Amino acid sequence: MLALIGRSGAGKSVLLRHLMGLVRPDKGRVLIEGVDLHRSSPSQRKALKERFGVLFQGGALFDSMTVFDNVAFPLREKSRLSEEEIRERVLKELALVELSGAEGKYPAEISGGMRKRVALARAIIHNPKIVFFDEPTTGLDPITARSIHQLIHSTHSRLRFTGVIVTHETWGLFSIVDRVALLHEGRILALGSPEQIMESREPVVREFLEPHRSFRSTAGQEAP
């Protein structure tokens, strides 16, 4: 999994929209599995996008639908499964994100952390090969954010998809990704393993990660 980090306004969300095929680049190409996303045929683009899963910023759940119907939505739109098969898969996925028993509730009736879990279940219900996570922990307290990161990690271990996480929050993130790219003013300023990024001497990288370093340093001290 790759984490795209950087300050607000660095270009993370714009890059994500390019990768998802929502924005056409002014120059350059977006290659996914060797296919040029913006120069391929409509049928090729459709087939490629059907392999995508997306956890949108804020969850983007349908307020008028129950948790069950939100998660079932991609299957009803993209698959030929029967309602019985859909029900079986949805309930299984909800159990895996620790939401058994919540299928009849509406988004307004559950917490922010639970809504993120519903959004994750919906993003992966059709077994995508590539999953895009847009600010998956924004608005959550540190403990809930960490639990979402761990849930993303366990889901990735189970399904083995390629994951791209866009975020400006690094708490608990570096323990679940393989590579990190830091964006600055629309360009990738640093790219490497979490360890390499943490040890970078690039001033912009060090400044961005200073709160993360301070937290780790404080957490590592023994209580008096």
Residue ranges with predicted function:
Residues 20:
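Helix-to-loop junction immediately C-terminal to a conserved catalytic motif
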Residues 125-129:
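A short, proline-enriched helix->beta-strand linker immediately N-terminal to the Walker B motif
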Residues 131-134:
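Catalytic Walker B motif of ABC-type/P-loop ATPase nucleotide-binding domains
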Residues 142-144:
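Helix N-cap at the start of a conserved alpha-helix in ABC-type nucleotide-binding domains
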